[in-house]
Amino acid sequence: DPGPPPKPFAMGLGIGSVTLDGVLYNQLALRPEINIAKVGIGLDLVVYIDNEGNMRDDEWDIENDPGLLLDKILFIRYGKKTDPAWIKYGSIEGLTLGYGGLMNNYSNMMEFPSVRRVGVNTGFNIGPVGGELFLSNIKDMSRGGTVTGLRAAYTVSDDLPLAIGVNFITDANMFSGLKDKDEDSYPDVFDDFPDDSTLWNDTDGDGWPDPGHGDSVLDSLVDIDADGDNIIDAEENISDINLKATPFSLKDNTASTTGLSFDIGYPVLQSDAISLMIYAEYNTLKFPAVSTSDSSFIRKERSGSGISVPGIRSTLFGILNLSLEYRIINGSYVPQFFDQAYD
């Protein structure tokens, strides 16, 4: 059932608070959606106001940075998932592949607007065959990869609407989601100077960098007591100076995970008021062994599987979704591993 066509115009409103560059702002966002035939465009028109009533201008300095116009586009969409071909670019919300054993209600918007991910979700329906492709954030492709999902499905016939599907999901680099504002390859969570690409370590936390950052840092800026023991480092033996190790680096380090699932489902009841689906699903997750170049991250190979049988899914009046599953889990399989909070 393709459902009713989208309204020509809709408006969303967002009110809340958000932290940007370490400052807490009140947020007022207007999110209009414009639909013309099969094309839909969602916009993000937002202002940030600090606790003194000042509006943050960074997002609206379009004269000096025309690229900010692209940030106002929340998504561009062509068609719906029931059409012969469809695609959506930008924000991805509520994405489920198959019956959700691997990916359920996934969103690339959880850290929006401090992190703006640009996803792609596209697919086709040709007779009894359907396909779907998903990329979480094409910006991460240059950092080793992003979450990618594929689904293929086949429906036996209109008289026997038994649907068989296969899903493949991989995160080619689980580290690519780590923020690195200064792009020095050291994630902000490990970087003592996340806004300065020439600095990264400050053992005693006094704001002065440790030695060892290279010739780009003047000697006058280097901490003379880097380990904070109240003894000038020049007067100590090197073996007595305890400094942080070089932080974990994103450079040449990756960790992946891969999931594969098979499902079969049959619609027992389908009407405007109620729908009822029964299904079974087999899922596997694999986490290959990882050892980073500096041994700061080590993970042994792990894997697991899960079976959902039987599964029952129902929708009441188009507003209430119910599901019930009996699961058998083995090893390191985590149901709905790629969910709303994954990123």
Language-model features: where?
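Intrinsic-disorder/low-complexity loop/linker signature
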Residues: 22, 53, 128, 185, ...
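Outer-membrane beta-barrel pore domains
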Residues: 14-20, 63, 179, 183, ...
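Solenoidal tandem-repeat scaffolds enriched in leucines and small polar residues
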Residues: 139-179, 193, 202, 240-269, ...
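A short, hydrophobic secondary-structure junction motif
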Residues: 74-76, 121, 175-176, 193, ...
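Extracellular calcium-associated, cysteine-rich motifs in secreted modular proteins
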Residues: 178-241
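Outer-membrane beta-barrel channel domains
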Residues: 2-11, 17, 23-156, 161-166, ...
